[in-house]
Curated annotation (Swiss-Prot):
Its main location: membrane. Plays a critical role in the incorporation of lipoproteins in the outer membrane after they are released by the LolA protein. Monomer. The gene is lolB. CDD domains: LolB. This is Outer-membrane lipoprotein LolB. It is a lipid-anchor.
Length: 209
């Protein structure tokens, strides 16, 4: 890639007013009631989502940090920790950004044939997009599966309600605001990291698994 500045185009081409779905309250919900983790219906659902090894999700995403603010449509395809893709579509242009994880690391490319690869996926995401989001964990967070060592809560709907998880010395929280009624998969998710002041609002419109 010849010009890193022309490639880092999210601010110019993706930046816009955060989509309506993501301008809903960015603060964590309060006065939420939870039930015991041993709930039989929750345990049955947990076993179901643990068996979903590969899947696709489509929807919209809004991201806010001290240095970046953008919203886009997204397509997420996950096979395993070394094979997944995240495609972002600008809401105000035809621009696209493709993030691909593979055996040798990560590649980020756009629809103008700009491309950058690196073995360190975390640093590449920060350099190109300005995001410090652990995509390897997002694969589980997106489908509402808490990590084994996560501090999580089960909602009165017998589904994952919220969790707290430490990654690279900082703390992420997630609140599962709504679920799809037809498959009990997450619909609206609020992810926050108060240490890095990042907020990620995700709306999943379609699940394929």
């Amino acid at each position: 890639m010849n010009n890193m500045k022309t490639f880092k185009f999210l601010t110019a081409l993706f930046a816009t007013a955060i989509l309506t779905a993501c301008t809903l309250d960015m603060e964590r919900p309060t006065n939420v009631q939870y039930i015991d983790k041993t709930d039989a219906i929750w345990q049955q659902h947990l076993q179901k989502i643990q068996k979903i090894q590969s899947y696709q999700a489509k929807g919209q995403i809004g991201y806010i940090s001290p240095t970046e603010r953008f919203s886009s449509r997204f397509e997420w395809q996950y096979q395993n920790p070394k094979s997944y893709t995240l495609k972002l579509y600008s809401l105000i242009s035809k621009s696209t950004l493709l993030i691909q994880m593979h055996q040798s690391g990560m590649t980020i490319s756009d629809n103008n044939d700009n491309q950058q690869s690196a073995a360190n996926a975390k640093l590449l995401l920060q350099e190109i997009i300005g995001m410090d989001v652990p995509l390897e964990h997002l694969a589980y967070w997106l489908k509402g599966q808490p990590a084994m060592n996560a501090d999580y809560q089960v909602g009165t709907n017998h589904l994952l309600g919220a969790f707290t998880y430490h990654v690279d010395g900082s703390q992420w929280t997630a609140d599962y605001l709504t679920y799809h009624s037809n498959n009990s998969m997450p619909e609206n998710i609020l992810l926050k990291n108060d240490s890095t002041k990042q907020t990620l609002k995700i709306r999943v419109d379609e699940w394929i698994y």
